[in-house]
Regions:
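Alpha-helical structural context detector biased toward long hydrophobic helices
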Residues: 1-6, 10-312
Length: 312
């Protein structure tokens, strides 16, 4: 496979929109023992400024194993990283963000609290596709494949140690990078099902006056309607109805709503609107719940779920 490569599962071109200097991110670290009170002594345990290069990154996350062609259709090592993400998916996301970020700034400057948006068919397509790809490229949807692959390798290793099964020693496990892609973000049937459904949903753009929409290592939040607890994140696009939230920048949010379940969204369909800090806090909670390791705040304000020490 050649040299090990560090590859981002949330692209740096996206993360920079939440960076306070263009190269670093105010980061809340999950998995730490979290206190309810922030002090100068303990806040460095879970709030840090981290380089864009060191978050949402993994070794050989997209690298195809060319020595395992039977399990990856003989693809070249860098085809996912270069041909799909670098040459196609990420430029499309960058263009979409640029287009609607400019509109968001205009809305804020003009104090237009609600305005209709004349989306082109191409814009609607690539907004949905960008959300679909980013949702599926996250590690959460890869963990089960890694577990299956580990079990397979252990079984093959055990069997190969028996003289009667020596031929199994040359059998490789899954190519996890390929299988992840094939089952999720490169799965055309799954994409068609997603797009057919979401094309009938209401699309809204929200603009925060405060400019502190969080993002995370799982930035696209999809909530299954009617579910409770952790089951809200277990979405089947074939059967379930859902809502989607995708922060494009620290002040711009993309949202989709089922009009049958949320009839009030019909009058807001294809609009861009300014929201207050209360609304910002609500969708920021979604990022916190959806994240695995990192939550990012442009303003370094994590007071939503960590209270500052009282003076009293």
């Amino acid at each position: 496979m050649g040299d090990t490569k560090r590859q981002h599962y949330v692209p740096r071109t996206f993360l920079k929109h939440f960076s306070f200097v263009g190269k670093r991110l105010h980061t809340f670290l999950l998995g730490k023992e979290i206190t309810s009170v922030i002090t100068e002594e303990n806040k460095s345990l879970f709030i840090k400024d981290i380089s864009l290069s060191d978050v949402c990154v993994s070794q050989d996350y997209y690298t195809i194993d060319e020595s395992n062609p039977s399990n990856n259709r003989g693809l070249k090592a860098m085809c996912l990283e270069k041909e799909f993400f670098q040459d196609f998916a990420e430029p499309k996301l960058t263009l979409i963000i640029k287009t609607f970020d400019e509109l968001a700034h205009k809305i804020l400057n003009d104090k237009q609290y609600v305005s209709s948006v004349k989306f082109t068919d191409e814009q609607l397509y690539y907004l949905a596709l960008s959300a679909f790809i980013q949702y599926h490229r996250s590690p959460r949807l890869r963990h089960s494949l890694e577990s299956v692959n580990s079990i397979m390798k252990n079984i093959l290793s055990t069997l190969a140690s028996d003289k009667e099964h020596k031929d199994l020693s040359n059998i490789k496990g899954l190519d996890v990078a390929f299988t992840h892609a094939d089952k999720t973000y490169l799965n055309l049937h799954l994409w068609r099902m997603f797009y057919l459904k979401i094309s009938n949903y209401c699309i809204l753009l929200r603009v925060s006056e405060n400019g502190n929409f969080f993002t995370s290592d799982n930035p696209v939040v999809i909530h299954k309607l009617g579910a409770k607890g952790k089951d809200t994140l277990n979405v089947n696009f074939y059967a379930d109805e859902f809502s989607l939230f995708f922060p494009l920048t620290s002040h711009l949010m993309l949202e989709y709503y089922n009009p049958t379940c949320f009839p009030e969204a019909l009058k807001m369909n294809k609009t861009i609107s300014i929201v207050d800090s209360k609304y910002e806090n609500q969708v920021n909670k979604y990022q916190y719940i959806n994240a695995e390791k990192f939550v990012f705040s442009y303003k370094n304000d994590f007071s939503l779920f960590l209270k500052p020490i009282s003076n009293g």
